[in-house]
């Protein structure tokens, strides 16, 4: 396979919304049977058990438990691209991309998820609260990494051998252990100088990741090296600090 069918992976967002008006759902998640297994388990949990699982305050647990009771995987669906509404997705701004950009995202962008495994932008999903790092006390798989195993990886690399990693470490770990020698995963890092040290700011990285996905969609990027032209927020590609597996962008 060539680089011309690259895939881009990003993390989901904790903040979610329901939007059934902006875009139509075009596809369904690849592993709904596995997601149903997780949903069935969560519905059996008590308030205290969910609080331990979610590590959240009473109000958040109460709201999410109420949503769980009525949740069904085939109703009140929102395209994943719009369902997640955190910082990264605000800067991606998929709702104002032209149709060609949206088509590009459906072909090239994949969202990793603790609840769904892996998603295309127009897969129909429901709001959920389940981070990939969650310790699944009481579940037959203590870890969601063990639950999903290599399924998201297999789906991701089904028709490509090159992936651009714009996900956090928590989520890219769903893919990286299974990589073969013939496959490439290029990790993008956005660094800024803080007191003489080059570091990645979590918030600024989310903003830049969203903008880079938007850049790729608008430009129809099909080669990893074309991402080196990205220069939003003052970030510039640093050839001196980059390798074949890591593209480093520095804020000047």
UniProtKB/Swiss-Prot annotation:
GO terms for biological process: response to hydroperoxide. Transmembrane segments: none annotated. It comes from Lactobacillus johnsonii (strain CNCM I-12250 / La1 / NCC 533). This is UPF0246 protein LJ_0535. GO terms for cellular component: cytosol. InterPro entries: YaaA (IPR005583). NCBIfam families: PRK02101.1-4. Pfam families: H2O2_YaaD (PF03883).
């Amino acid at each position: 396979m060539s680089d011309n069918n690259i895939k881009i992976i990003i993390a989901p967002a904790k903040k979610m919304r329901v939007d059934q008006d902006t875009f139509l759902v075009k596809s369904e998640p690849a592993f709904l049977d596995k997601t149903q297994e997780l949903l069935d388990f969560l519905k059996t949990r008590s308030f205290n058990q969910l609080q331990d699982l979610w590590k959240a305050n009473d109000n958040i647990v109460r709201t999410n438990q109420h949503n769980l009771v009525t949740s069904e995987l085939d109703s009140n669906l929102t395209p994943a691209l719009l369902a997640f509404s955190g910082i990264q997705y605000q800067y991606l701004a998929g709702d104002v991309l032209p149709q060609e950009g949206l088509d590009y995202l459906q072909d090239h962008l994949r969202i990793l998820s603790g609840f769904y495994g892996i998603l295309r932008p127009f897969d129909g999903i429901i709001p959920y609260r389940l981070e990939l790092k969650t310790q699944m006390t009481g579940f037959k798989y203590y870890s969601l990494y063990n639950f999903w195993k290599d399924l998201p990886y297999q789906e991701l690399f089904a028709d490509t051998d090159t992936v651009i990693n714009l996900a956090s470490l928590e989520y890219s770990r769903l893919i990286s252990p299974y990589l073969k020698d013939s496959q490439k995963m290029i990790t993008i890092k956005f660094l800024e100088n803080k007191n003489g040290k080059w570091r990645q700011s979590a918030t600024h990285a989310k903003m830049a990741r969203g903008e880079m996905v938007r850049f790729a969609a608008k430009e129809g990027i099909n080669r990893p090296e074309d991402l080196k032209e990205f220069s939003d927020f003052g970030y510039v590609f640093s050839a001196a600090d980059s390798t074949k597996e890591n593209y480093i962008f520095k804020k000047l």
